[in-house]
Each structure stands twice: as structure tokens, then as C-alpha cells.
């Protein structure tokens, strides 16, 4: 632990002791213990790095007792929040939309961004050397698609294309289903496909940021940037939010929002413990920011409840 983080931990403990005395606001008494749900990383069991420091930091922010609840998967996390066993949950975009569909009782509070300003992803259909001229020509070409559980490479494009009246059946003869996203990319590189579905990271205004996405990996595999063309691009799918129950007291929301949106600038080591994948900090978000995720969940539900 860095010296700055140790110093912050000491201040948090001292300040928490001062804040959390017997005189509490009614909303704190009503809640009793504020519970935060999180899904552990694969193979981590019930362990969360820096759990003690994170717990004390949220305790300090809210001025009340806080506990972290580690769920085995998103389905368990959703049930816990829907049944009011936790007040706060850290979701993927589609898990949040599933929770909203399940109970209508959750609202997004903040979501992470990348250091370069990317706030989510957009699906893309990429071709090489102009082989695919447009969506209308797909039926006469070979189109690689990642597996059905790939959000950016399968679920998002299927949902968006259906909304654009260019619906693709999952068993369409021109689709080549790949076992992984990497396998779909290899098909394009090796010439076994004329185009592939994939994704790019995108900023809030929707402009694509290609680093780290499918096009960047294709270029790393040897394709020239000038040989790749984007045939189609979806709307923005935001990174998953930190969500609270809709009945959470406004003062608790305010305290959490102030704490989270300032966390990266005030205590970056603590931010990295809470959010390890997107290093740019937290921004406030609203339900409308997850309209795309909700549409994906509706598609999955209509298609037989595939999770």
C-alpha cells in the first residue's frame, strides 16, 4: 500500500469515528447497515482486494455502517437488490438493465470512463479491401460473428439491426458463428470471411475511439489500417453503472455521488481498488443512458430468456 493510501486510511478511520456517533439522520436509522453488492472476479471466491479500506471509505462518505456483500454472479446480485437485501450494486450494463426489468426499483448513479474519455462501446461491422459494400449485400457474402453471448459482437448488432429493419436471423446461412471473438477476427484475417462483427470503444458523443477494440486487434494481426472499412456502426452501449435502489434517500445519493465523482482526483489508489478496468474516474449517469442495454435485454427476453 502506498504512503498516500496509508495516510488516507488513517484519516478515514479517524473521520469515520467522528461522523458515526449516536446522533444520526432518520434515513440512516431506517437503513441500519448500508450494503453494497459486488460480483467477485473469477477465481477470487468471496475476496475483494482492499475490502477493508473500501468499506471504511464508504462508511466515511455516508456516516453510517457499511458492509460489502459478494455475490456469486450477476443473477444473485440482481435478486439481492430487487429484494432490498442490498442498497447499492456494481453492474455491467446488461446486468443493470436486467435488474431494472426485474423490479423497476433501481437507478444508475455513476459509471466509469476510460482515461481517454471513452464511456462505452459501439458494435461495428468491419470488412477488408471493400469486399462488403453495405448491409444489403450481406446475404451474398460470408459474415463472421462472435458467439451468441458476446454483447458487443452479437447481442448488440442483432438488436440494433432488427430496430433498423435489417434483422438477421441467428441461423442465417451467410453468418459464420465463431467460438470466440478472436476466432471471428482470424476468419477475416485469413480470408475465410468477408466481414466480421466486433466493437470499438466510444466517447460520450458517440465518436469511435479505435484503440483497444476489434479494429486495433485486426491491425495487430497484420491487416493494414487502410484495408479495413467500417460498414455499419451501432449506437453507444455505456459501461456498467453503480446503481442504487430507487427508494434510497436523496441525501444518501448526494453523499455517494460527491464521494464517487471526486474519488479519482482525490484518492486515485482507492479509485483503482473500486474500479480496475476503466481508469478515467466516475461520471454521473441517468436511466436514459442505458436505453441500449435495456433494448438488448428485451431482445434476449423475447428470444427465450437467454442470459
Predicted feature locations:
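Sec/Tat signal peptide C-region and signal peptidase I cleavage site
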Residues: 21-25
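Bilobed "Venus flytrap"/periplasmic-binding protein-like clamshell domains
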Residues: 31, 35-59, 94, 118-186, ...
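An extracytoplasmic/periplasmic, membrane-proximal ligand-sensing/linker region
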Residues: 27-53, 244-307
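Pocket-lining segment of extracytoplasmic ligand-binding domains
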Residues: 142-249
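Beta->alpha turn/N-cap motifs
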Residues: 38-40, 70-74, 84-102, 111-112, ...
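A structural signal for short loop-to-beta-strand junctions that line the ligand-binding cleft
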Residues: 105-118, 227-233
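Bacterial N-terminal signal peptides
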Residues: 6-19
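A bilobed periplasmic-binding-protein/Venus flytrap-type ligand-binding module shared by bacterial periplasmic
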Residues: 39-40, 122-132, 234-251
Amino acid at each position: 500500500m502506498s504512503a498516500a493510501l496509508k495516510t488516507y486510511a488513517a484519516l478515514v478511520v479517524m473521520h469515520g469515528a467522528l461522523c458515526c456517533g449516536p446522533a444520526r439522520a432518520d434515513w440512516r436509522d431506517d437503513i441500519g447497515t448500508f450494503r453494497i453488492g459486488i460480483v467477485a472476479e473469477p477465481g477470487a471466491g468471496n475476496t475483494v482486494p482492499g475490502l477493508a479500506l473500501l468499506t471504511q471509505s464508504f462508511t466515511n462518505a455516508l456516516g453510517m455502517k457499511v458492509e460489502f456483500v459478494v455475490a456469486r454472479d450477476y443473477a444473485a446480485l440482481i435478486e439481492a437488490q430487487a429484494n432490498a437485501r442490498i442498497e447499492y450494486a456494481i453492474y455491467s450494463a446488461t446486468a443493470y438493465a436486467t435488474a431494472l426489468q426485474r423490479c423497476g426499483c433501481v437507478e444508475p448513479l455513476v459509471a466509469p470512463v476510460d482515461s481517454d474519455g471513452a464511456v462505452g462501446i459501439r458494435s461495428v461491422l468491419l470488412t477488408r479491401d471493400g469486399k462488403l459494400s453495405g448491409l444489403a449485400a450481406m446475404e451474398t457474402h460470408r459474415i463472421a460473428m462472435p458467439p451468441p453471448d458476446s454483447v458487443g459482437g452479437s447481442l448488440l448488432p442483432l438488436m440494433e439491426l432488427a430496430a433498423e429493419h435489417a434483422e438477421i436471423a441467428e441461423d442465417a446461412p451467410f453468418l459464420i458463428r465463431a467460438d470466440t471473438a478472436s476466432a471471428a477476427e482470424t476468419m477475416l484475417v485469413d480470408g475465410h470471411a468477408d466481414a466480421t462483427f466486433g466493437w470499438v470503444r466510444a466517447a460520450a458523443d458517440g465518436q469511435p475511439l479505435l484503440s483497444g477494440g476489434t479494429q486495433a486487434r485486426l491491425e495487430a494481426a497484420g491487416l493494414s489500417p487502410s484495408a479495413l472499412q467500417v460498414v455499419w456502426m451501432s449506437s453507444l452501449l455505456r459501461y456498467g453503472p453503480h446503481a442504487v435502489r430507487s427508494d434510497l434517500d436523496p441525501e444518501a445519493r448526494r453523499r455517494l455521488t460527491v464521494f464517487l465523482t471526486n474519488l479519482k482526483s482525490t484518492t486515485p489508489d482507492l479509485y483503482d481498488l473500486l474500479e480496475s478496468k476503466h481508469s478515467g474516474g466516475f461520471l454521473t449517469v441517468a436511466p436514459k443512458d442505458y436505453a441500449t442495454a435495456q433494448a438488448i435485454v428485451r431482445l434476449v427476453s423475447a428470444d427465450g430468456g437467454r442470459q
